[in-house]
A protein has these predicted regions:
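Short, flexible helix-coil linker/hinge segments at the edges of structured domains or between repeats
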Residues: 157, 162-173, 180-182
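Surface-exposed strand-loop-strand hairpins of Gram-negative outer-membrane beta-barrel proteins
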Residues: 35-56, 125-130, 159, 168-169
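Long C-terminal intrinsically disordered regulatory segments enriched in low-complexity Pro/Ser/Thr
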Residues: 152-154
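Gram-negative (and chloroplast) outer-membrane scaffold detector with strong preference
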Residues: 32, 56-143, 147-149, 174-187
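Transmembrane beta-strand segments of Gram-negative outer membrane beta-barrel proteins
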Residues: 24-36, 66
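Short acidic, glycine/proline-rich loop/turn micro-motifs
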Residues: 40-44, 80-82, 119-123, 162-165
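Cleavable N-terminal export/targeting peptides
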Residues: 1-27
Length: 187
């Protein structure tokens, strides 16, 4: 009798303390980008460097089915020769799948969207923006029965074509990698 009670207690405790999103009816996640490393070059062949990133990631889903998400962030660009503050604005819409693995929450996804340069907060007149695509993964660890803390990695591909001047038709390669940190809620 005591053995059955102990086994039942362990099983109940495991379900309560180590619940994952696979048991939840709805999962909701928010996050922020921590770093954006550019891997491409501008039209002159110079390396594009990030000077900080701000924004958000949001995703919502249900178990077994793919979920949807949205990323929106701005990356300041280091530019010694620029006369204006230059930023890269990225907006993505994502489709993701939460793999049903106990204890950890592993998410894989893809996204599509747009990138554009901003000059002092407005669209730069020398470009119309470009299309962007990404793949990403997120690894979450439960911190409480209904919450998890997750670290994400995004690999973004995008090129922005110059539409005026002597560089017309040339493209800035603004692809790179974005690391993020977030928290997930499971209802």
């Amino acid at each position: 009798m005591i053995r059955k009670i102990i086994i039942s207690f362990i099983a109940a405790t495991s379900l309560i303390l180590f619940s994952t999103q696979a048991f939840a009816l709805l999962n909701f996640s928010v996050g922020v980008p921590l770093s954006h490393t550019m891997t491409g070059n501008d039209t002159a062949g110079n390396e594009i460097k990030s000077d900080g990133v701000s924004g958000y990631f949001v995703q919502v889903g249900v178990p077994i089915l793919p979920g949807i998400g949205m990323d929106s962030y701005k990356t300041k660009i280091k530019c010694a020769a620029c006369t204006v503050e230059l930023e890269l604005e990225t907006s993505m819409y994502n489709l993701y799948y939460l793999l049903p693995i106990p204890i950890i929450n592993l998410t894989v996804g893809v996204g599509a969207g747009k990138t554009k340069f901003l000059c002092d907060g407005s669209d730069c007149s020398w470009q119309d923006g470009g299309t962007a695509s990404q793949w990403y993964t997120s690894l979450g660890f439960p911190i409480l029965p209904l919450f998890d803390l997750h670290l994400s990695y995004r690999s973004v591909s995008s090129k922005i074509e110059t539409t005026t001047g002597s560089d017309k038709g040339k493209k800035d390669d603004v692809g790179g990698n974005v690391m993020g940190l977030g928290i997930g809620f499971n209802f």
